[in-house]
Design a protein with these regions (language model features):
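Class I S-adenosyl-L-methionine-dependent methyltransferase catalytic core
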Residues: 1-171
Length: 171
């Protein structure tokens, strides 16, 4: 795997990836998140490391460190909004999901909804364990705390081995 660090904050590689999940989004997802597990949020963003703050406020035990995703493994599951592109890493979304599956780490990852229409997702889906949480609205993200943006795409939570009560949930 490329040594390119998924740490996100600023610079050439992070400039277009500094879009953070709002507290509103985390609040909508919270009823479907495990309260009894340690949640690893591995995709650190130095410009606004808000996921730990928001999830802690919602009562979750969270690990969110400025570390290389490819070289670390924390917690019981991963729930996060990963970067979609990083210069020098092709097929990033696929590589993230494969790494977590190889670690046998259950996950909930927020991706553009079009991700479920890709050939790589169809291949991974055949392995089993996938569930989807579909927002009933288009999410907006924030660059910094409180600074909302208009998103051009719809999003979906792609879940694997999270043992949700249903395979398709609309929130």
């Amino acid at each position: 795997m490329s040594k390119a660090k998924i740490g996100l904050g600023g610079g050439k590689n992070g400039a277009t990836n500094d879009w953070n999940t709002t507290k509103y989004i985390w609040t909508k997802l919270a009823p479907h998140m495990p309260k009894d597990k340690v949640i690893w949020c591995p995709f650190y963003n130095k410009t606004a490391p808000m996921c730990e703050k928001y999830l802690t406020e919602l009562g979750f035990n969270v690990i969110h460190k400025d570390e290389d995703f490819w070289e670390n493994n924390h917690g019981d599951c991963v729930i996060d909004n990963p970067p979609y592109k990083i210069s020098g890493i092709i097929k990033l979304k696929e590589k993230i999901m494969i790494r977590l599956m190889e670690l046998e780490k259950p996950f909930m990852l927020l991706f553009p909804a079009s991700t479920i229409q890709t050939a790589f997702f169809k291949r991974l889906y055949e392995r089993g364990g996938f569930q989807l949480i579909c927002p009933s609205e288009k999410y907006d993200y924030e660059r910094f705390e409180g600074e909302k943006t208009r998103c051009m795409w719809y999003s979906v939570w792609i879940c694997w081995n999270m043992n949700l009560p249903k395979d398709f949930i609309v929130i």
